Amino acid sequence: MEKVLSIAGSDSTGGAGIQADLKTFEEYGVFGFSSLTSIVTMDPTTGWSHEVTELPETLLEKQLISVFAGGPVAALKTGMMGNEQNIKMASKYIKQEKI
């Protein structure tokens, strides 16, 4: 089974982000891996306003090291990157792994 990676934010409602990506990957018969860049929370008491917590690039790098240690990735999808440092970190591994 091919391995596919999503580098994106997490949406606790499952309607977007990593959670939605993993469901889509499963529908297409590929094994989904994920690396989080941010966490999105929503407050139902304020009309579902969003709050985004960005994760540091050092944490993203640790996740990417874990994913790529398991062998090659057939495809990659990016979503909300959170900040410029995460974009640069993801780019480093995309180039390094030749995805």
Feature map (PLM): residue ranges:
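Extreme N-terminal starter segment of soluble prokaryotic enzymes
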Residues: 1-5
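N-terminal glycine-rich anion-binding loops that anchor highly charged ligand groups
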Residues: 28-42
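Residue-level detector of alpha-helical secondary structure
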Residues: 20-24, 38, 59, 63-66
